[in-house]
Amino acid sequence: MNEVVNSGVMNIASLVVSVVVLLIGLILWFFINRASSRTNEQIELLEALLDQQKRQNALLRRLCEANEPEKADKKTIESQKSVEDEDIIRLVAER
């Protein structure tokens, strides 16, 4: 008689453990699937952002090329550099 009762309890315990493992598996699957779909959405948004930035960079290059001043002669450039160098030297504190 003991064997019949114990075997019934073991079957129920085995069934309960199986159901608990199944529920834990489903919950894990839900959260992993949800995280994966969010990641895919973020990747799509980042790709769209990258595409927009490439377009903006191309437009900025066009604007810079259109507004680019004529090439100045070397003397003017050198004098501007020397003035800038002097300004930088003035900013540096003496020790």
Swiss-Prot record:
Entry keyword set: Cell membrane, Membrane, Transmembrane, Transmembrane helix
Membrane-topology annotation of the record: Single-pass membrane protein
Protein's cellular compartments: Cell membrane
A Pfam entry, by short name: YebO
InterPro entries, A to Z: YebO
GO cellular component, as recorded: plasma membrane
Broad class of where this protein is predominantly found: membrane
Membrane-spanning segments: 12-32
Name assigned to this protein: Uncharacterized protein YebO
Organism: Escherichia coli O157:H7
